[in-house]
Design a protein with these regions (language model features):
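Conserved N-terminal phosphate-binding loop of PLP-dependent enzymes in the Aspartate aminotransferase
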Residues: 1-142
């Protein structure tokens, strides 16, 4: 079941209260199972300092990929990366190569010249290195 939050100014909230009526509520809003799972996940993230390491891990991806000649640019926020190739035709071929290697990725709906990397926050450095090795193997085949 999903867990979400809605944060708003009083002005916007009062509008959504009436038009549509209760337009700010969710189907599972406040469901105890969702809240318990969300609380446990937050506790794990805090106790294990997972978020504190996200920037370093994202930088590692960037460092290991940036020097490949097929990579034109890397845009990144933490562990959310867009790797720009500059040409849609190259990216379409790359996605097919990714599938052959068991890599799950795709282009962005708004940008068909870049592929996404969005690993779990708990990814290890060794897993990042293995992932980048596979990505580079595919890039080399373009």
């Amino acid at each position: 079941m999903p867990l979400g939050a809605f944060v708003s100014s009083q002005e916007i909230m009062s509008t959504l209260t009436h038009n549509p009526v209760l337009g700010h509520i969710t189907t599972f809003g406040g469901h105890p199972v969702c809240c318990a799972a969300g609380l446990a996940a937050m506790k794990f993230l805090q106790d294990n300092k997972v978020v504190e390491d996200v920037e370093r891990k994202g930088a590692l991806y960037e460092e290991l990929l940036a020097d490949h000649p097929a990579v034109k640019e890397i845009r990144r926020s933490g562990l959310l990366l867009a790797v720009e190739l500059g040409e849609a035709s190259k990216l379409y071929c790359l996605i097919d190569l990714f599938i052959e290697e068991g890599i799950m990725s795709d282009w962005f709906l708004y940008c068909d010249t870049a592929f996404r990397i969005s690993p779990p926050l708990i990814i290890t450095d060794d897993e990042i290195r293995n992932c980048v090795a596979l990505i580079r193997k595919c890039l080399d085949r373009l």
